[in-house]
């Protein structure tokens, strides 16, 4: 059995909830649809819900089984912001936290902090430095870790 098959079997045995903040990217959307169809993870697209659905329709990509967190939904943003502000790891004041609810990359990381997803996956549209900075700011570093590397 090859490495990729082993990894697929391990993922399918214990699917994680994964947030994808770059779902508007066609390559990412196709990958997320395939992951969901193969039940390798519970996929969560984070972005403009209407635009994600429109792009999926245009591209002929099924979003069946994929949760969408719509960053344009003001009511959902307010509820998420309230939860985040009460979390001990929140480093922002109310206005700063509210701004981050509408930014897919930061919202995905906040979902991770809140335990709504296990992990966030990005890097096709966002620069590595932006991802590291957002992750370090919102999620933070593990105890004993003081240096970040993208290698």
Name what the model sees in each region.
Residues 1-128, 134:
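Contiguous, glycine/small-aliphatic-enriched amphipathic segments in soluble metabolic enzymes
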């Amino acid at each position: 059995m090859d490495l990729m098959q082993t990894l697929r079997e391990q993922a399918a045995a214990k699917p994680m909830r994964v947030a994808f903040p770059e779902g508007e990217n066609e390559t990412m959307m196709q990958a997320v649809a395939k992951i969901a169809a193969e039940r390798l993870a519970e996929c969560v697209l984070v972005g403009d819900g209407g635009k994600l659905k429109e792009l999926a329709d245009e591209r002929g990509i099924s979003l069946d089984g994929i949760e969408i967190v719509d960053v344009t939904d003001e009511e959902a943003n307010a509820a998420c912001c309230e939860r985040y502000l009460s979390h001990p790891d929140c480093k922002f004041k109310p206005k700063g936290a509210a701004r981050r609810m509408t930014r897919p990359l930061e919202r995905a990381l906040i979902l991770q902090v809140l335990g709504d997803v296990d992990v966030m996956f990005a890097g096709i549209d966002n620069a590595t430095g932006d991802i590291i900075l957002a992750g370090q700011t919102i999620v933070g570093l593990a105890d004993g870790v003081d240096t970040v590397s993208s290698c």
